[in-house]
């Protein structure tokens, strides 16, 4: 699994002209799933995300997790995170998992992340054409890939 985490002042996702979900202060997370991703990847990633210390403490130092900061999370499925640009100029998405694999993993990721956060995680709609709006705070943007657990 590959995620791009952005610390946001607010974020929202619109589908067919209607706001599907919106959050205030917290994280907007793009998540891409590939064929070899597993339930173990979800567990590791959820723990990593909720414990990332990317929120400012009283001294302005990034020393608080989203749990301590009581922030919200918006998760957006994003198969293009697995784009390969090795050949030519048109990205290939062959590494992205097919829906029969990615949908159950995406749903489990969102459920497990809600449990780890202790409140509902807002989402877009898997496979939909979405308009995502956010105000990046910092900016703080973190990329994590479960195939490269550093």
From Swiss-Prot:
Any one GO MF annotation of this record: Ser(Gly)-tRNA(Ala) hydrolase activity
Superkingdom of the organism of origin: Bacteria
Subcellular location: Cytoplasm
Lineage, highest ranks first: Bacteria, Pseudomonadati, Bacteroidota, Bacteroidia, Bacteroidales
PANTHER family the UniProt entry points to: D-AMINOACYL-TRNA DEACYLASE 1, D-TYROSYL-TRNA TYR DEACYLASE
Gene Ontology process terms (BP): D-amino acid catabolic process
Pfam families on file: Tyr_Deacylase (PF02580)
Organism: Bacteroides fragilis (strain ATCC 25285 / DSM 2151 / CCUG 4856 / JCM 11019 / LMG 10263 / NCTC 9343 / Onslow / VPI 2553 / EN-2)
EC number assigned by the record: 3.1.1.96
Subunit note: Homodimer.
Purpose of the protein: An aminoacyl-tRNA editing enzyme that deacylates mischarged D-aminoacyl-tRNAs. Also deacylates mischarged glycyl-tRNA(Ala), protecting cells against glycine mischarging by AlaRS. Acts via tRNA-based rather than protein-based catalysis; rejects L-amino acids rather than detecting D-amino acids in the active site. By recycling D-aminoacyl-tRNA to D-amino acids and free tRNA molecules, this enzyme counteracts the toxicity associated with the formation of D-aminoacyl-tRNA entities in vivo and helps enforce protein L-homochirality.
Known catalytic reactions: glycyl-tRNA(Ala) + H2O = tRNA(Ala) + glycine + H(+); a D-aminoacyl-tRNA + H2O = a tRNA + a D-alpha-amino acid + H(+)
Motif, Gly-cisPro motif, important for rejection of L-amino acids: chain positions: 138-139
Entry's free-text remark on domains: A Gly-cisPro motif from one monomer fits into the active site of the other monomer to allow specific chiral rejection of L-amino acids.
Transmembrane segments: none
Keywords: Cytoplasm, Hydrolase, RNA-binding, tRNA-binding
One GO location term (cellular component): cytoplasm
Protein name, per record: D-aminoacyl-tRNA deacylase
Similarity-based family: Belongs to the DTD family.
């Amino acid at each position: 699994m590959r995620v791009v985490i952005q610390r946001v002042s607010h974020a929202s996702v619109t589908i067919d002209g209607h706001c599907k979900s919106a959050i205030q202060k917290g994280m907007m997370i793009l998540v891409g799933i590939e064929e070899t991703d597993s339930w173990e990847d979800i567990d590791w990633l959820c723990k990593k995300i909720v414990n990332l210390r990317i929120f400012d403490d009283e001294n302005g130092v990034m020393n608080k997790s989203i749990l301590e900061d009581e922030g919200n999370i918006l998760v957006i499925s994003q198969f293009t995170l697995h784009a390969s640009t090795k050949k030519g100029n048109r990205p290939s998405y062959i590494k992205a998992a097919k829906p029969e694999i990615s949908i159950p993993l995406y749903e489990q990721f969102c459920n497990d992340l809600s449990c780890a956060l202790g409140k509902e995680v807002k989402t877009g709609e898997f496979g939909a054409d979405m308009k995502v709006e956010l105000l990046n705070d910092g900016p703080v943007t973190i990329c994590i890939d479960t195939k490269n657990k550093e």
